[in-house]
Amino acid sequence: ILVSSVDQSKASRRVRSACDQGINYFDVAPTYGDAEERLGPALEGIRNQVFLACKTTERSKKGVEQELHRSLKRLRTSHFDLYQLHAMTTQEDLEEVTKPDGALDAFIAARDQGLIRYIGFSAHSAEIAEQLMDQFDFDSVLFPINWVNYFQENFGPGVVKKAEEKGVGRLALKAMARSKWAEGADRSQFPKCWYTPVENE
């Protein structure tokens, strides 16, 4: 569900409606517009009923510490159930987060302090995702998994296999992607989609 760029009452209604229908996993990030500011108030009174995941694009220990506390404050929560390195894409990303005083040092400290329960990452590079799982015992990987990428482009099977071998939880993003947007396609109905979504079964 989308809660950014809408007024608080609409965001809260969407969240409550989702919870009423059994949805209990919510994923947000500072880069998602004002989603943190909208989701925080919407979860008041029901925070203990949901699994709340957040992300950071910061790559240094200090940067993560600062952004983590900002996100906790915006979301009005004492902890995140899952905190993730956001958009791990390049070799430089990998080197930055794993070096001394890199992001992972902050993640480990935050887990020890009870500010986060699980440590994960999101990635759009199969190579980087697999390397990361070899370098650290992550709890989860958030990765594009859909019929088009997986079966037509062979993008994903290696990540899934590595995650299974390492005991890393798999979370799918872009699961409803059908194809890339055609040149000049009308995107007005799906302004926030980076791809043509599946609209029916």
At which residue positions do the language-model features occur?
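Beta/alpha (TIM)-barrel catalytic core signal, keyed to glycine-rich beta->alpha loops juxtaposed to Asp/Glu
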Residues: 88-201
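Active-site groove signature of glycoside hydrolases
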Residues: 72-95
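Active-site mouth loops of central-metabolism enzymes
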Residues: 1-10, 53-63, 91-96, 187-199
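A structural motif
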Residues: 23, 77-80, 116, 138
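Conserved, mostly hydrophobic/aromatic
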Residues: 18, 26, 39, 52, ...
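Short, acidic/polar
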Residues: 5-18, 61-76, 124-133, 201
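N-terminal binding-site loop/beta-alpha segment at the start of enzyme catalytic domains
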Residues: 1-50
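Acidic (Asp/Glu)-rich catalytic clusters
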Residues: 19-20, 39-48, 69-78, 132-136, ...
